[in-house]
């Protein structure tokens, strides 16, 4: 791992030269599970921090076509108890016939929530063929395309401009923020609303959380997200954080009514500098943290305790890869039948069902919890009859984290 000056990368948010980076090694695409053990392609993961706007970012993103042409990340299987707050906000400021587009609508789950809330004029955009088909089957009109200025213009010609643009768990995936921002400007009416939800990068700094998913190429705090809004003529109305897949940050913005309406702000202030300093600290502490994680897990192994992962996902799998602890695991358990019987890419760790996994456990076992915090207590309660199980989480902000996080 090297922390160094970046010679040839510019920030994809503000365009400034990036000054500091950390090399986390080469890793596979974590959601590309294998039908049988095999060697897979690995990609470099170098992360840079911007001293000017505070955004930290993966420097060389994998081409989006590698992920999203045909992609199975159905949102309907995920519990999202935090959504009621956003739905309440939108219903309090928008009429039932307000024209709303959900960018990256996936299988249409949030569109369905909007429909259940009483909204009637709903459209989605989803680049993956299989997920967009599911949303269409649920009764929604969906544009099966990536969003850029050209497609935004086509959508506006077809549908007109929108009263509200929803962008949930999408902006962190976007490698061309300038083009995406211009497209959003095209879609929303003057005075219209923009709702954005992203993972909160403050969790990475505080956790610390080094489980970087290769699909998440941008890591926003409230300051860098507000910077994105203002660059695109959108003023921040409200923001809040929720427990979901770590911690997520939700903001509601409003497009300025006319170009002459000023958005005075100092783009590079103390808060963005603080974000950069947090990134530098996070970077320089990585090696020590990794060593402590490896020592802690191996200490269980050396005592004859079997080590098993529970929950194969886009946070847990990168954690194992980046920490270099795959060699300590016997197998992984996951409740999703689509994953069972397959193998983790790169490590070739077998994924089994709960019934199969529990039957394999003999004596004391360390269960590394790779499920989100909101699901931990339910899972532990269901396994409480096995007193020989030791539960330790690998995903902040859990209260059951490995000691290395302290």
Range-by-range predicted roles:
Residues 25-26, 33, 205-209, 251, ...:
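Short aromatic-enriched loop/helix-cap "lid" or pocket-rim segments at secondary-structure transitions
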Residues 41-134, 139, 143-145, 208, ...:
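Extended interfacial segments that mediate partner engagement and assembly in macromolecular machines
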Residues 38, 140-144, 212-215, 256, ...:
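Short, hinge-like loop/turn segments at secondary-structure boundaries
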Residues 202-276:
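Contiguous mid-protein beta-loop-alpha structural module that forms a pocket-lining wall or clamp
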Residues 88-210, 219-232, 253, 317-319, ...:
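Conserved SAM-binding loop
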Residues 89-90, 113, 252, 257-406:
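Hydrophobic, well-ordered beta-alpha structural blocks that scaffold small-molecule cofactor pockets
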Residues 19, 143, 237-240, 352, ...:
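General small-molecule cofactor/ligand-binding pocket signal
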Residues 2-79, 240, 250-252:
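N-terminal juxtadomain amphipathic helix
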């Amino acid at each position: 791992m090297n922390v160094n000056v970046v010679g040839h990368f510019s920030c994809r948010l503000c365009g400034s030269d990036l000054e500091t980076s950390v090399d986390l090694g080469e890793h596979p695409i974590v959601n590309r599970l294998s039908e049988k053990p095999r060697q897979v392609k690995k990609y470099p993961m170098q992360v840079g921090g911007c001293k000017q706007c505070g955004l930290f970012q993966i420097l060389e993103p994998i081409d989006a076509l590698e992920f999203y042409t045909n992609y199975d990340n159905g949102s309907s299987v995920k519990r999202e108890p935090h959504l009621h707050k956003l739905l309440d906000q939108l219903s309090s400021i928008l009429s039932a016939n307000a024209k709303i587009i959900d960018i990256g609508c996936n299988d249409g789950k949030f569109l369905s929530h909007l429909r259940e809330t009483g909204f009637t004029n709903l459209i989605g955009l989803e680049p993956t063929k299989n997920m967009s088909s599911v949303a269409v089957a649920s009764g929604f009109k969906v544009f099966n395309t990536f969003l850029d200025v050209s497609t935004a213009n086509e959508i506006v010609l077809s549908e007109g401009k929108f009263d509200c643009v929803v962008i949930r768990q999408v902006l962190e995936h976007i490698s061309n923020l300038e083009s995406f921002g211009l497209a959003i400007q095209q879609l929303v009416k003057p005075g219209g609303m923009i709702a954005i939800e992203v993972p909160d990068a403050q969790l990475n700094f505080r956790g610390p959380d080094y489980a970087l998913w290769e699909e998440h190429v941008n890591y926003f705090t409230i300051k860098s997200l507000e910077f994105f809004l203002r660059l695109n003529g959108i003023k921040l109305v409200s923001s809040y954080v929720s427990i979901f897949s770590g911690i997520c940050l939700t903001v509601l913005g409003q497009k300025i009514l006319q170009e002459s309406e000023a958005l005075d702000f100092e783009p590079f202030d103390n808060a963005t500098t603080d974000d950069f300093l947090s990134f530098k600290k996070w970077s320089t502490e990585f090696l020590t943290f990794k060593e402590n994680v490896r020592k802690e897990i191996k200490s269980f192994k050396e005592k004859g305790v079997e080590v098993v992962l529970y929950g194969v996902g886009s946070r847990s799998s990168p954690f194992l890869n980046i920490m270099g602890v795959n060699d300590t695991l016997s197998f992984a358990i996951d409740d999703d039948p689509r994953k069972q019987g397959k193998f983790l890419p790169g490590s070739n760790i077998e994924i089994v069902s709960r019934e199969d996994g529990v039957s394999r456990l003999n004596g004391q076992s360390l269960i590394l919890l790779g499920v989100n915090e909101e699901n931990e207590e339910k899972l532990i309660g269901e396994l409480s009859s096995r007193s020989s199980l030791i539960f330790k989480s690998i995903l902040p902000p859990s209260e059951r984290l490995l000691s290395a996080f302290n």
